[in-house]
Swiss-Prot record:
One of its GO terms (cellular component) is nucleoplasm. Belongs to the SHQ1 family. The keyword Glycoprotein does not apply. The lineage of its organism: Eukaryota, Metazoa, Chordata, Craniata, Vertebrata. This is Protein SHQ1 homolog. Transmembrane segments: none annotated. Signal peptide: none annotated. The gene is shq1. Residues 445-521, 541-575 are annotated as: Disordered.
């Protein structure tokens, strides 16, 4: 038989059941109504529902069939008008069989009879009683190496350890007791914590601030209305067709948990919801390929098979893992995820079930993580449908009453942040000081420019004085020996025109001089280099002083004698030569490199 897809809604007087039977015949439909039991049969479909309230067949019931869509709508009156049926959206729990059974199950739940009056339970205490530590024996250690929902599984990883290394952080879970798991987890978190990554997310606030402004769908539902009654909670939570299909596929079963294991199941649920709320916030509700990794990595229950004993330990463990593993490692995100979890629990077990179904779908699509559905998520999806709403509300109040600080996480975050701020202040002050040194006042630049102009004018004056003295000496020498003057003109032809052109070029270069802010050392080196070229090029030789009778020789003979005398000077014969006196202070206006044409004239 096939269990058909169905949906249930209610108003104050009637219960409406919509059943999808596309391949059924309208002539073969049977409906059975009695008390809290509803049965539907249309070959090949069969549906049996155990309702949370009583219905009655009094003639007001009716059924309609849409042959085009293959949908049957059954409207059944409530036995007590105005009664609210709780948990109609928890489809798996509605499929539970009741009444007499033809065969007894292998494991029977004691006290499941309808005639047994449910005892009123005391207020749930979320703090498990502490017991003194006793060194366990080897047999006791083997019995403690259990995991999964309610610690009901063991031996799963004995043959699959290599394949499941990427799923969980715990190695050899089948031989590692709970106390050793906690110790290894704390050591791994301490080794994984990266101060640089944490400080980068702390001071780069823009990405984190954007994530902090996001509101998950359940927070928006809480803000949309003030009422948190069971009826209001069910109206706010709706399941998709895919989620309803998944609920119908779950096998309905009862979990036999003692008080301690039941409390650990509730605490593990908080751990799962914290990891899920963080994932929804950082992805802004848009799941990606990293979603499965984020959820299982942030949950110590999934990654280390941790069994918590109090809510505070869960919050501390979650905060430590947020600062060690994901992309965004900020303490404000930890606080936001805790607040989101409180809001989710306030919305009721239907909202919790919806989130668990989303986790189940994420793991189902991730190849190595599907094993976590078998160990935890599937059982949580079935179990949460049967828990009492007041326990979920009590769990929400417990989480809301607690808070954690950075000092609780054990990473010395306060000292780390203070040291980072001091370093940041020092760097800021150093940058301000360097910028002040680089930006010189405008008045200083102007004064340096005026000093440069004055030094240039002084150099021009000294150069002109030197030229005057040189011209006077040459004039006196020409008067004393006019032949020597003619010889100098023959040796260095066109010297006067070259000096004149040099002065003109120097005047043009003066107009092209760079601003006063240029480096003075570079200009000085260039001046020295050009001066050496000028000294090597501009050398004026005078004729040697001889007897008086030699002065009436022709210029050609004088040139020959000069050549002979220069040859004798190379052999050691003393000769008197005079050079043009160069001013000891270099004048940049007279330093002009010789052209190739001038070099040829100087050689001839």
């Amino acid at each position: 038989m096939i269990t058909p897809a169905f949906d249930i809604s209610q108003d104050s007087d009637f219960l409406t059941i919509i059943i999808k039977v596309p391949y059924a015949r309208a002539s073969e439909i049977d409906i059975y109504i009695e008390g809290d039991d509803f049965k539907f049969y249309a070959k090949p479909y069969f549906l049996r529902l155990a309702l949370p309230g009583r219905i009655v067949e009094d003639g007001r019931q009716k059924a309609t069939y849409n042959a085009d869509d293959g949908i049957i709508t059954v409207s059944v009156p409530k036995e007590t008008p105005g009664q609210h049926f709780e948990g109609l959206d928890l489809l798996t729990s509605l499929l539970a069989p009741r009444g007499s059974k033809s065969a007894k199950p292998l494991v029977e739940e004691i006290g499941s009879s309808d005639n047994v009056v449910e005892e009123e339970e005391d207020e749930f205490d979320w703090q498990i009683e502490q017991t003194p530590f006793v060194e366990p024996t080897e047999e006791a250690l083997q019995s403690q190496c259990t995991y999964g929902f309610g610690n009901l599984r063991s031996g799963v990883f004995r043959r699959l350890q290599e394949e499941l290394n990427d799923v969980i952080d715990l190695r050899d879970p089948d031989v590692t007791p709970a106390s050793e798991r906690t110790r290894r987890r704390l050591a791994a978190e301490k080794a994984k914590f990266d101060p640089d990554h944490y400080l980068a997310d702390l001071f780069e606030e823009e990405p984190v601030q954007h994530l902090l402004k996001y509101q998950p769908w359940w927070v928006a539902e809480i803000h949309a209305g003030c009422s948190l009654s069971a009826e209001s909670q069910e109206r706010r939570v709706s399941f998709s067709d895919k989620q309803k299909e998944q609920l119908r596929k779950f096998t309905n079963k009862s979990h036999l948990l003692d008080k301690k294991t039941q409390q650990q199941a509730y605490l593990g649920l908080i751990d799962l919801l914290l990891a899920y709320c963080y994932e929804v916030r950082v992805t802004e509700g848009d799941q990606n390929v990293e979603s499965a990794w984020n959820i299982r990595k942030l949950s110590s229950t999934l990654s280390w098979f941790e069994n918590f004993t109090c809510v505070k330990d869960i919050l501390v463990s979650f905060g430590r893992r947020v600062l060690c593993y994901p992309l965004y490692r900020n303490f404000q995100l930890v606080e936001k995820a805790i607040a989101d979890t409180v809001s989710l629990l306030k919305l009721g077990k239907a909202a919790v079930l919806k989130c668990l179904l989303e986790i189940h779908a994420i793991f189902q699509e991730n190849d190595p993580a599907y094993i976590l559905n078998d160990l935890y998520i599937t059982d949580y999806c079935i179990w949460i449908q049967k828990v009492k709403s007041k326990k979920v509300a009590s769990l929400s109040d417990c989480v809301q009453s607690l808070s954690i600080s950075k000092s609780d996480l054990g990473f010395e975050l306060g000292e780390l942040e203070e040291a980072a701020r001091l370093v940041q202040e020092e760097e800021t002050q150093g940058q301000l000081a360097s910028s002040t040194c680089l930006v010189r006042p405008l008045a200083t630049v102007a004064s340096e420019s005026s000093d440069t102009d004055s030094s240039t004018s002084d150099t021009d004056d000294s150069s002109s004085e030197t030229e005057d003295s040189t011209s006077e000496e040459s004039t006196s020498e020409e008067e004393a020996d006019p032949t020597d003057s003619e010889l100098q003109k023959a040796i260095v032809p066109g010297q006067n025109s070259r000096v004149q052109s040099s002065l003109e070029k120097a005047g043009e270069e003066k107009n092209k001089l760079p601003a006063a802010g240029k480096a003075e050392t570079t200009v000085t080196e260039q001046m020295k280099h050009l001066a050496e070229k000028m000294n090597s090029a501009v050398i004026l030789s005078e004729a040697p002083v001889g007897p008086p009778g030699v002065q009436d020789k022709s210029p050609e003979k004088k040139a020959g004698e000069c050549t002979a005398q220069s040859a004798q000077s190379t052999t050691g014969t003393p000769m008197t030569r005079e050079f043009l006196e160069v001013t000891p202070r270099l004048n940049p206006l007279l330093i002009v490199p010789l052209s190739d044409e001038d070099d040829e004239l100087a050689e001839h």
